[in-house]
Regions:
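N-terminal secretory/targeting leader peptides
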Residues: 18-114, 123, 131-324
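Thiol/selenol-based redox catalytic cores and closely related redox-interacting motifs
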Residues: 128
Length: 324
């Protein structure tokens, strides 16, 4: 049923990556987040910068809130050329490019500065380029903060408190392994189904960053938010290669420059949103728990060990990131 609904929207808008309007090309950009989210604000910056650089010859029409489907569904639209640009989690991209898995290793990054030194340097750029063979070219990374646990009825103060709890995770093996290693029961589920799932007790909680916790209203059905900050999985701004290859060299430069500018602006939006989100959650009665992160890091060590055992070819990449 959802597939046909998405198909209907595509037919109604006549989506074919972009549309020629007089002297302008209109790029279609779809993502799953609400318009209050700092990532959406970053995308608005991308839109404004691109239109300014191109003097209106390249414009962007945005479809937020999952209007065109889940992250995976929108990626498929990019691959066939029906949508030009999207934003997805690096965890979702790991289903195509294995190197993205590494970015989700628990407690891999020592700090925010360390993370973006890696992402904006040689290592991060090389990962972005690897998606092209799947028709998904990476433009830049957006800050998605650090992910932490939140629950509806039982507080998580130590990893032992996760025992017996069903925790929603993305459909990503790294996230699944992490929750299971800490003692919880990882439950993959579409993000759009999560509010009702927590409300009805289908799952006991989930894990995400503060802005997503609040902008998706999950704070309304969760009593506890535990700032264990177990992973810092970035978002990725992508352009379909079917569209990219139709652009001139100058148009490609405009797109890349606009993306880079939006990434820097989005970091500011993100930091502002984290502060505001924590205040909103506290005001709503959510208990913010500051745990001993070392306990969670120790429990999750097996995730990295198992990952490099199964993917020895990733050992060099992991070591490069640690050495940055």
């Amino acid at each position: 049923m959802r597939y046909y609904a998405i198909l209907l929207v595509i037919l109604c808008f006549g989506l074919v990556s972009c549309k020629q309007e007089s002297d302008s090309k209109v790029l279609y950009l779809a993502h799953t987040l609400p318009q209050t989210h700092p990532v959406h604000k970053g995308i608005l910056t991308f839109q404004e910068a691109l239109e300014k650089k191109s003097k209106g010859s390249l414009k962007i029409k945005i479809f937020p809130d999952g209007q065109l489907g889940s992250e995976r569904e929108v990626l498929e639209l990019l691959q066939i050329g029906s949508v030009a640009v999207t934003k997805v989690s690096a965890a979702t991209m790991s289903n195509f490019v294995p190197e993205y898995h590494v970015l989700g290793i628990p407690y891999l990054f020592k700090s925010k500065e360390h993370q973006f030194n890696v992402l904006e340097g040689e290592v991060g750029k090389s990962i972005l380029e690897k998606g092209s063979k799947f028709w998904l070219r990476g433009l830049c990374y957006y800050d998605a903060g650090s992910r932490s646990f939140y629950t509806s009825s039982k507080a998580i103060r130590t990893p032992d408190d996760l025992k017996g709890l069903k925790i929603r995770v993305m459909n990503n093996q790294m996230a699944i392994n992490m929750v299971n290693a800490m003692g919880g029961s990882a439950t993959p589920m579409a993000y759009g189904e999560l509010y009702t799932a927590i409300q009805q007790g289908v799952v006991d909680g989930a894990e995400n960053n503060p802005p997503s916790f609040v902008s998706s209203n999950h704070y309304e059905v969760s009593k506890y938010y535990t700032l264990d900050q177990h992973s810092s999985v970035p978002d990725v701004l992508l352009i379909g290669t079917k569209f990219w290859e139709k652009l001139s060299a100058q148009e490609r430069l405009w797109v890349q420059e606009a993306a880079d500018e939006s990434a820097q602006a989005q970091k500011i939006f993100w930091n502002e949103s984290v502060k505001a989100s924590m205040e909103t959650a506290k005001a709503a009665g959510v208990e913010i728990i500051i745990p001993e992160k070392a306990l969670f890091a120790e429990k999750s060590k097996s995730v990295l060990e198992e990952f490099v055992k199964e993917h020895p070819e990733m050992t060099e990449l992991v070591n490069k990131i640690k050495a940055e």
